[in-house]
A protein has these predicted regions:
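Phosphate-group recognition and catalysis centered on beta-loop-alpha active-site segments
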Residues: 1-184
């Protein structure tokens, strides 16, 4: 059967800001079995949950320590603790075009450690548009399921790429999911 999912708490935007602890609490209260959240790394190496590379005031997360961030931005550890009992899709945000790009993919190592500490691989999938980031995570812990995100191109090519990199799934950008693409 299909699992109920609450991407980033978006189903209750008026009640809680997405990617926050209150949003994950609400997701549980609404009966979500899975949530999706976005992971980024700070200057001091802490993985935090935030969609954008920059804060509203323009400061880049990767140039700030966790203590310099607004209080509403949780660490990934705090978020995973809050999500206990639910499955979690952790999207690692790490594109070369992002101002917080982590060329060494250290975020992958940190995420792998947090998954093992808080949830385990059976209640987790880690996704990213950056295949190198996913490859690094797989090298650190091959038991964690991975999903390749893609926004353009032929889904068959994305499937082939995901298979070549030992990934569990593909996650296409919403507009790419049509009846005809699903049938293929």
């Amino acid at each position: 059967r299909a699992a109920a999912a609450a991407p980033q708490g978006r189903g209750a935007r008026e009640a809680a800001q997405e990617n926050t602890l209150p949003a994950f609490r609400l997701a549980r209260e609404f009966g979500a079995e899975w949530v999706e959240l976005d992971a980024r790394r700070t200057a001091d190496g802490v993985v935090v949950v935030h969609h954008d590379a920059q804060l509203a005031d323009g400061r880049v997360l990767a140039e700030l320590t966790v203590d310099e961030l607004p209080e509403f931005i949780p660490s990934l550890a705090e978020a995973l603790e809050e999500c206990h009992g639910m499955g979690v899709n952790i999207e690692i945000k790490n594109l070369p075009s992002d101002p917080d790009y982590d060329a060494d993919h250290l975020v992958s190592e940190a995420v792998a450690g947090l998954v093992q500490a808080y949830l385990g691989p059976e209640r987790t999938i880690v996704s990213s548009f950056n295949i190198d980031t996913l490859d690094r995570l797989h090298a650190v812990d091959p038991t964690i399921p991975l999903a390749y995100l893609f926004a353009i191109g032929d889904p068959a090519m994305a499937i082939a790429r995901a298979c070549a990199h030992e990934m569990t799934a593909i996650h296409p950008y919403d507009p790419l999911v049509t009846a005809s693409s699903v049938e293929r």
